[in-house]
C-alpha cells in the first residue's frame, strides 16, 4: 500500500492555473498533489552571442526553490553565492526538454526565458516544472502572435511536453512518487515525452538495489500511461 493510498498506476490530483502572474507573457501555476510550481515564460528580444545573426531564437530555463518550500527551511542559493549541482542539473534538463518542442527558427532572434519556482515541494518538482513550463511557453507563443511579434500563421510549437516520475517502491513499480515514496524508493526514474508519443529523456537511478529490464519496462509503461493522462487533462 502506498502512503497516500493511491493505486500504483494513479497520478496525484493535477491542477493548472493559467495567467497566474500578470507580467510574464506566459505563466502557469501547476499542482501535482502538494507539489506546486510557478512556471513563467518571458519573451526577450535578442539572443545569446553564439546565436547572433543565425536567424534562430533561443530557449533557456532556470529553476529554484523557495526557502520554505521544503519541510525545513533552506537558505536561498543567492545567499550561499552559488547554485547547487542539483539545481544546475535540473535547469539543464528543463531547457533540453523544452527546446525539443520549439522550432527556434520560427520565433526569430528572440529568447524565451523559462523560470520554474517551486513554492511547495512534495516530490516530482522537476517533472512538474517541465509540464508547467510547456504550458507557459504555449501561452507565450500565443501572446507573441496576438501582439505582432509573430505572424498569426506561424507555428513554432512542434509539440507539447510533459514529464512524470516513476519508481520501485516496496518492490512494486509506482507512478508519480510523492516525497515519502521518493525518499524510500529502491529506484527513481523521470520520463519526459512529447505529445506525439516520442521520448525526449529518461533519467533512472537505482538506490542501493538494481532494477531488472522487466521492471524498467513496467516503469516506462506506467510513465507512458501517466503522461497520456496529463496530456488529456491539461493540454
From Swiss-Prot:
Keywords: Nucleotidyltransferase, RNA-binding, rRNA processing, Transferase, tRNA processing, tRNA-binding. One of its GO terms (molecular function) is tRNA nucleotidyltransferase activity. Its EC number is 2.7.7.56. GO terms for biological process: rRNA catabolic process; rRNA processing; tRNA processing. Phosphate binds at residues 86, 124-126. Gene3D superfamilies: GHMP Kinase, N-terminal domain. Pfam families: RNase_PH, RNase_PH_C. Belongs to the RNase PH family. Homohexameric ring arranged as a trimer of dimers. This is Ribonuclease PH. It comes from Francisella tularensis subsp. novicida (strain U112). The gene is rph.
Amino acid at each position: 500500500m502506498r502512503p497516500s493510498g493511491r493505486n500504483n498506476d494513479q497520478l496525484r490530483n493535477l491542477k493548472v492555473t493559467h495567467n497566474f502572474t500578470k507580467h510574464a507573457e506566459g505563466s502557469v501555476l501547476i499542482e501535482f498533489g502538494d507539489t506546486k510550481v510557478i512556471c513563467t515564460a518571458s519573451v526577450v528580444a535578442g539572443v545569446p552571442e553564439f546565436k547572433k545573426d543565425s536567424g534562430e531564437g533561443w530557449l533557456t530555463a532556470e529553476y529554484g526553490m523557495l526557502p520554505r518550500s521544503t519541510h525545513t527551511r533552506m537558505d536561498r542559493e543567492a545567499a550561499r553565492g552559488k547554485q547547487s549541482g542539483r539545481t544546475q542539473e535540473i535547469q539543464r534538463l528543463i531547457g533540453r526538454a523544452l527546446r525539443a518542442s520549439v522550432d527556434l527558427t520560427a520565433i526569430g532572434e528572440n529568447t524565451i526565458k523559462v523560470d520554474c519556482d517551486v513554492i511547495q515541494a512534495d516530490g516530482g518538482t522537476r517533472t512538474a516544472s517541465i509540464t508547467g513550463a510547456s504550458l507557459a511557453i504555449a501561452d507565450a507563443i500565443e501572446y507573441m502572435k496576438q501582439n505582432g511579434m509573430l505572424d498569426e500563421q506561424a507555428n513554432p510549437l512542434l509539440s507539447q511536453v510533459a514529464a512524470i516520475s516513476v519508481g520501485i517502491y516496496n518492490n512494486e513499480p509506482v507512478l508519480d512518487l510523492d516525497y515519502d515514496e521518493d525518499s524510500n524508493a529502491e529506484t527513481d526514474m523521470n520520463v519526459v515525452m512529447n505529445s506525439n508519443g516520442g521520448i525526449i529523456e529518461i533519467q533512472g537511478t537505482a538506490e542501493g538495489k538494481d532494477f531488472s529490464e522487466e521492471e524498467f519496462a513496467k516503469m516506462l509503461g506506467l510513465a507512458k500511461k501517466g503522461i497520456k493522462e496529463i496530456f488529456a487533462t491539461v493540454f
